Amino acid sequence: MIAMDRIARIPIARWTSRAFRVSAAARQTPMSPLEAHNELEPVYAAIDDRLNTVRSKLNRPLTLAEKVLYGHLDDPERVPVRGETFLKLRPERVALQDATAQMALIQFMASARPQVAVPSTIHCDHLIAAEVGAEEDMAKAKSQNKEVYDFLASAGAKYGLGFWKPGSGIIHQIVLENYAFPGLLMIGTDSHTPNAGGLGACAVGVGGADAVDVMVGLPWELKAPKVIGVKLTGKLQEWASPKDVILKVAGILTVKGGTGAIVEYFGEGVDSLSCTGMGTICNMGAEIGATTSMFPYNSRMGDYLKATGRDGIASLADSFSEQLRADENAVYDQLIEINLSELEPHINGPFTPDLAHPLSKFKEEVEKNGWPAELTVGLIGSCTNSSYEDMARSASVVKQALSHGVKSKSIFNITPGSEQVRATISRDGILDTFTEAGGTVLANACGPCIGQWNRSDVPKGTPNSIITSFNRNFSQRNDGNPQTHAFVASPEIVTAMSLAGSLKFNPATDSLQGADGAEFKLAAPSGDELPVMGFDPGEDTFQPPSDDSTSILVQIDPDSQRLSFLEPFPAWDGKDYTDMPVLIKARGKCTTDHISMAGPWLKFRGHLDNISNNMLIGAVNDENGEINNVKNAVTGEYGTVPDTARAYKAEGVKWVVIGDENYGEGSSREHAALEPRHLGGVAVIVKSFARIHETNLKKQGMLPLTFNNPADYDKIDSSDKVSLVGLKNLTPGEPVTMTVTKADGTSMDILLNHTFNDEQLEWFRAGSALNKIKIDLGT
């Protein structure tokens, strides 16, 4: 099924220099139906011009990823080198979700710019907790989060951002329905922004500081990614779905195998996938550390564009399609081949999204590992799998069970991805099918996927299993219970297992017992890719930017516990960092969920000091194997990680964190970098970083450093004192020396690496990227 090579030349389509030109009079295709003044024709013409310049320099065929990235270069005269060059790029769009938007907008306000420089939107999806059902939960969220929603709405109106009110849906589904288009380059303050790759966009998850760069009019910096090609052949069969493609790829590449790379799908099998199915695959590319994932433009994307009222974009993309797919003989740094005809459903987990199990072997794995076989809850939806097709196919499974008098044996929760999807599946009877089987429809929001779940069916600490169509399944992520074994699968498999109430049920081979006692088998799911009667937009939940923002005030109550202006971090004083304690040596997986938990902490995302009370409370202390219990090197007493950091800060003691592999994987949340900076940390020293977190640390004036020899991690003890010397000579490509002093007074030097370029070193010296922006703008 799978073949892998280091370098691969794949025949795709011949390449030639070309010119895409339209007259000024013909420029009439809006990039979004909601933004008639932003036209697409000039975007495609600019991409074409830049690519012709780049081709003259490289003189070789280009991958799709290269075409879109290099087509947005600020200076196409500079020759890009994959894996080496830092690119200066000009994205067309920025998207912010409400949890990360707060700090991003507070930073933008500090820049003193009057309006955002590119089309930008705010999406209210992260602050809505699931508990009872959609209506009750939404009312509660609007009441509890009124201060934050009012701030975001007024900031959007003041600074020119579109505002999607609570209940609109999940950011990535809204982007796909309204803003994404083939060839788009966009950034979003959420790690699953790559979802838009299902519509041929190059969409990258970033921290808020990166978003601020683009919103103030600066180019966005990205190290030129390598490109991993995934060739798809054949056609999905029976119970297999697009979700199984990325579950399989995650098993191959692992959670860090895509780091520093874009995953690009191609091959005849692509045309058998729906646009939203391709979005699912791109969405979960975040779980392998990929910069983003992309599909080439095809008729399935055109169908989706037309179904969502963007016929003009589909027509224009058809005429520009040569630049929306890879060239013939494009070179990939790595190749994976998957025959869709042979791909079986997969279930990944628990506790990590890359532990992949074919469905046929999953029962055996459950028994062998002693995982709780009883399925307590099944959840479908989320930004990964909440399309009309996902819901229709899942409903087809439920209808079969209902015809035999069978309802869900597990608690069954459904999360529509957007108000448009909710209204459409309600009109078409799909929601009624789910509720008839005992399902509970949750709000159009992230909910349990990000830990916004006030779960009451299982006491915390009780071993249990859940299965979801979400993207992540880290320990405690969904419900805060470290004993919840969370598994990830397609919505069809989740639905079937929920009906059976067991992880051991294989819908492809096993039978259910009907109300009459007779056994029956479920047929493979089916469902329309797009609604036959078209989409129902539902309630209007969009607030466009104000035409006149001069009179709009954006205020923050100085006594607020939810929002606070950001005090500038101090600039580097030009001295080495010496005799610093190790706040914590984190053992094993340390995601951004471990560093800055979500769930109940989301309400403090706009208040840095308050949310800093969750810093690293989920990380395992290598010294004692405990969570949130570290030794204060000054007093000798044990305390929580945040309290110990605050004690150091009060005494003027700088500190460092030591970490393992792929430190900071997961969410794009920049709070995981802001918090250690705020509490007095100066460096994070690990075996390896996840891309977004490493950048976020740099943006906040921290030193993200990696062991030159990963085995040196084992030489560090929590009781050590460390010094980072020679910082005045810190230059790109040159290692940093760390002197480690043991408790007995002996010392050793350890070499550390970094990935700073010259401009990023200016962030460090200025104290943060925002400080540097303000210096450059004279504000």
From Swiss-Prot:
Localization per record: Mitochondrion
InterPro entries, per the entry: Acnase/IPM_dHydase_lsu_aba_1/3, Acoase/IPM_deHydtase_lsu_aba, Aconitase/3IPM_dehydase_swvl, Aconitase/IPM_isomerase, Aconitase_4Fe-4S_BS, Aconitase_4Fe-4S_dom, Aconitase_dom2, Aconitase_mito-like
Binding-site list for substrate: 97, 190-192, 472, 477, 605, 668-669
CDD domains according to UniProt: AcnA_Mitochon_Swivel (cd01578), AcnA_Mitochondrial (cd01584)
Pathway assigned in UniProt: Carbohydrate metabolism; tricarboxylic acid cycle; isocitrate from oxaloacetate: step 2/2
Cofactor(s) essential for the protein: [4Fe-4S] cluster
Protein name per Swiss-Prot or TrEMBL: Aconitate hydratase, mitochondrial
Native species: Gracilaria gracilis (Red alga)
Lineage: Eukaryota, Rhodophyta, Florideophyceae, Rhodymeniophycidae, Gracilariales
